[in-house]
Amino acid sequence: MMKKIIRFLCLLIIVLASVGVAGCQRQENSWQTIKSRGTLVIGVDDSFVPMDFRQKNGKLVGFDVDLAKAVCKEIGLKPDFQTIDWSMKETELRNGTIDVIWNGYTKTKARAKKVAFSKPYLENDQILVTRKNKGIYNYRQMKGKILGVQTGSSGADDLDNYPKVLKKRVKSTVLYDTYNNAFIDLKAGRIDGLLIDGVYANYYLAHSKYQKEFKKEKLPYPSEKFSVGINKKDKTLKNKINQALNHLEKTGKLKKIREKWFN
């Protein structure tokens, strides 16, 4: 009987050791695949100012674009920016069609169950934008009103996680694929308020001729931190990105990129 137990324990140790080695090989192989390819495939929403957006000539620019280029230079890769359906970002990452999510991507507990995160590199808040002529001066006055929010955004998560702030006040919620489309409806009066990332709203309104027509209010949701979303198995890639971010911070290059886009 004792021999059988010992034999079983030996087999168990061998199996566990094999799983551990296989896991390490998968992590290393994924990095080697990326390294051999020479590019980092980056999933973005190309309408999210000032993080990733298109100029009139179609060129992709933004804070995250500049930061991703700087990080890729540090780790010896070329960035390959791919526009994705933002509501499908985690699926794209899991399926391997992209290597990272890098587009004002907020680290949350729910997302951390599916995605690994780099160290944070920027803070953000959720705000409410309304038309001044609507007579809505704070979020409490959204009772019975129509609220716009982007599908798959951290604002949509906050709406569900903290229902007393807005969800239980508003009459209904309209989901949008992009903030651009949401702002069109807000201007036209088809929605009464827009739940939106502060970095987007501040930049968008600062560059809009209609900025005096709108009011902004920081909402009582927890402050957020933007990070790079990485497949959980890609630990080597995560370490490489973190090392690059640390180096950019120490050399002052990250500060220069922040100042360029956020003055």
Task: Spell out what each predicted region is.
Residues C24-S30, S36, S154-V174, K212-E217, ...:
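Ligand-binding clefts/hinges and TM-proximal coupling segments of bilobed small-molecule sensing domains
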Residues Q25, V65-E74, R140, K145-I146, ...:
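Extended ligand-binding regions for polar small-molecule ligands
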Residues E28-G104, T251:
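Extracytoplasmic small-molecule ligand-binding "clamshell" domains
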Residues T33, T130-L147:
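Flexible hinge/capping segments at coil-to-helix
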Residues D46, E123-T130, G198, A206-N246, ...:
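Periplasmic-binding protein-like
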Residues Q55, A68-L77, G155-Y176, L205-Y210:
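Ligand-binding cleft/hinge of the Venus flytrap
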Residues Y105-K113, D158-N161, D185-A188, D192-P222:
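A ligand-binding cleft/hinge motif common to bilobed small-molecule-binding domains
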